[in-house]
C-alpha cells in the first residue's frame, strides 16, 4: 500500500507532473520523450486488443484520456492524490460519457473482468508490492500494460531525491519483470524498451 508520504508528494506536485505532458517537443528536449512513447504504446495495445473498457490506474492529470476517447473507448481513471484527481476530472469533462475519474488507490482495485485492458504508467516505480498490484490488475482485466524504470543512474538519482521525502523508487530488469509476471498469474506478451527510461510491458492473464 502506498504511504501517506507518497500521496502527499504527488498531491503537492500535481501541476509539475501535469506540465510534463503539455508539449512533446519540449519534453523530448528535456529528456522526457519516453513519457509520450509509453502513452502511444499503451494506446497501441488498446487498439490491438480491440478494447472498449480501460482502467487507467494512477491516471494523474489524464494524459491518456484524449487518445483513448478518440477511439470511443470508455476509461475509468483512478488516482489517490486529490490534486491529480481535480486535474483529471477537468480533463474528463472534455470527453463526456467516455471518462470517469475516481479518487482511490490501487489497493482498492477489486473488480473482476470489469475492463478489457488495465494500464499503469509511472506507477510501478513507486510500489513496494508490485506483485500485489499486477495481480489485482490481472483480475480486473485480461490485458495489462505497465511501465517499469530500469535500475540505472537515473533511477538511482530519483531514489535519492524522492527517498528524502519518504517516497520509494524501484528499478526493474527484464528478468525481474518475468519473475513478477509469474508471481502474479500473468505472462509477458511483449517488452518494449524505452531507452534509459526502462520498459513498457504488455502482460496477458495466464491460462487457468
Language-model segments: what does each one mean?
Residues 1-48, 51-58:
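Conserved class I S-adenosyl-L-methionine
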Residues 61-99, 104-107:
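Class I SAM-dependent methyltransferase SAM/SAH-binding core
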Residues 141-149:
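Conserved beta-strand signature within the Rossmann-like core of class I S-adenosyl-L-methionine
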Amino acid at each position: 500500500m502506498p504511504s501517506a508520504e507518497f500521496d502527499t508528494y504527488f498531491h503537492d506536485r500535481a501541476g509539475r507532473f501535469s506540465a510534463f505532458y503539455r508539449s512533446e517537443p519540449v519534453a523530448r528536449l528535456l529528456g522526457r520523450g519516453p513519457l509520450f512513447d509509453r502513452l502511444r504504446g499503451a494506446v497501441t495495445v488498446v487498439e490491438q486488443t480491440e478494447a472498449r473498457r480501460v482502467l487507467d490506474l494512477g491516471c494523474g492529470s489524464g494524459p491518456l484520456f484524449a487518445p483513448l476517447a478518440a477511439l470511443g473507448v470508455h476509461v475509468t481513471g483512478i488516482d489517490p492524490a486529490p490534486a491529480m484527481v481535480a486535474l483529471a476530472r477537468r480533463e474528463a469533462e472534455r470527453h463526456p460519457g467516455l471518462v470517469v475519474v475516481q479518487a482511490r488507490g490501487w489497493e482498492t482495485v477489486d473488480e473482476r473482468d470489469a475492463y478489457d485492458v488495465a494500464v499503469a504508467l509511472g506507477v510501478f516505480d513507486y510500489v513496494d508490492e508490485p506483485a500485489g498490484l499486477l495481480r489485482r490488475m490481472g483480475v480486473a482485466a485480461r490485458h495489462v500494460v505497465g511501465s517499469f524504470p530500469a535500475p540505472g543512474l537515473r533511477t538511482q538519482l530519483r531514489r535519492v531525491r524522492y527517498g528524502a521525502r519518504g517516497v520509494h523508487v524501484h528499478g526493474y530488469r527484464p528478468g525481474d519483470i518475468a519473475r513478477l509476471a509469474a508471481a502474479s498469474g500473468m505472462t509477458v506478451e511483449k517488452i518494449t524498451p524505452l531507452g534509459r527510461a526502462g520498459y513498457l510491458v504488455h502482460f496477458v492473464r495466464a491460462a487457468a
